[in-house]
Amino acid sequence: MFGRGPSLLLYVLLIASVAQAQQSTPAAPVVVQPGAPGMPTKTLPANTRGKLPPESPKDVEFMQGMIMHHSQAVEMTALIQSHTENKELRSLGARISSSQSDEMKFMQHWLAARGDPISMAMPGMPEMDMAGRPMAMMPGMLTAAQMRALQDARGAEFDRLFLTGMIQHHNGALTMVKDLFNTAGAGQDADLFNFATDADNTQRAEIRIMQGMLEKTR
């Protein structure tokens, strides 16, 4: 009877080691695919290879156009340092320049990851920027004449032209976001949706700030 002791002990140790191995074996990874806005998520097989969601031509047009749109806003803010001593306007301009420069990098990466060109086609004779480069006109963008007037202004006159121009510019961006979401099949990419929504919220808030600042100049 006592001769069975070692065998029983080995059996117990074997069972314990198997149980421990089972506990230490990591669970198979779960791949969850986010749904489009308003749609449920999907659970995919663990061996699913990642791929970018399909894009709409309007998505590409929106990103390309918004890069050009942001580029002019950054160009406008670059004038502030040498054209006005208004500290509040300088602070606002620095925020706009920083945020829109970062957003341009995001949009360029988004397009490049999908093999799309960064710049949009510009049929016909486009407007020119302050450096004489061709410039596509998106909603709300300042004309070449408006940009020259802004460049020539100083002090309080510059403040007024900058604020009215940037309010116009921001309202154009809101129009672009609205057009994106009003287009069937567009804006379904999660990254694009989040970016466009954040841009809309940010620019609405900045419009209210600039309207308040503009009142002080009158």
Where are these regions (language model features)?
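N-terminal secretory signal peptides that target proteins for export/translocation
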Residues: M1-G3
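All-alpha RGS (Regulator of G-protein Signaling) helical domain and cognate RGS-like helical scaffolds
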Residues: Q23-R218
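Bacterial N-terminal signal peptides
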Residues: S7-S17
